[in-house]
Amino acid sequence: MTGFLGLAGFQWLLLLAALQAVLLMADAFIGHYRSGFSLRAQYAPFVSGVLLLLSAVAVSIAPGRAALTTAAVATGTLALLAGLVGAGYHHWYGITTKPGGYRWLLHHLLHHAPPLAPFALSVAGSLVVLGARGGSGADQLLGAPIRLLVLGVVTVALLGLAGQSALLHYRGAFNQPAMYIPVIVLPLAAGSIVWHLAAPSATAARGIAAALLWATFLGGFVGAGMHLRGMDRQMGGLAMGVAAVIDAPPPGAPLLVAVLGASGLVALHLL
């Protein structure tokens, strides 16, 4: 395992997971504020997210400390479960109980609770668990190498983000050619990781995976700029403040893509 800028790979992984927690909490706040926090369960991602953030930062500062590692594993597991429960809530209240139910499935997927969004909390929780265990010196978890598990989590997360992007960009009628980028690049990056895991000694597989993960990382910042531009194009633009944020493309979503790309690069090169 190698380091970068004085930090080991697992420390970087934990800090990136903490950043992911911040971004997903911001995104969740916008969505739940839009719906008026009509359910108490809508506060759950913030409780779980804050605990995850604090434990991830703490164990990244002092890796290997038993108490901090235990706390990080506990909060990571809590976040993983909270994300799964949240996905169930989004499914129940966003599809099942809506008029038309599954007969209006596409309508509900486009205009109600985003079905895959809660899984971002599960992804962050999983990465914190893996980062904490790896930072304490463990090579495996549940019988599998931690590096493989990290790359597996990143792969699944990239596919989920591609699916969610496809839904939301379809809702936006793909009015900009750049809206196709995450729908194309993220699955390619996920596929390249699978290729690398299937043929770890293949230089081409590793190089292509690295290139596509860099494209994912940099593309996330480009997407964030375009989402801000989308906010400014609303009536009244950014001067509308909260109204612009609520009704415009989610500003933090592309940054989650960048964080996942960085997490994949950390696993590829530093673990």
Predicted regions and their residues:
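Hydrophobic cores of alpha-helical transmembrane segments in multi-pass inner/ER membrane proteins
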Residues: V47-A58, P114-A132, I184-W195, P250-L268
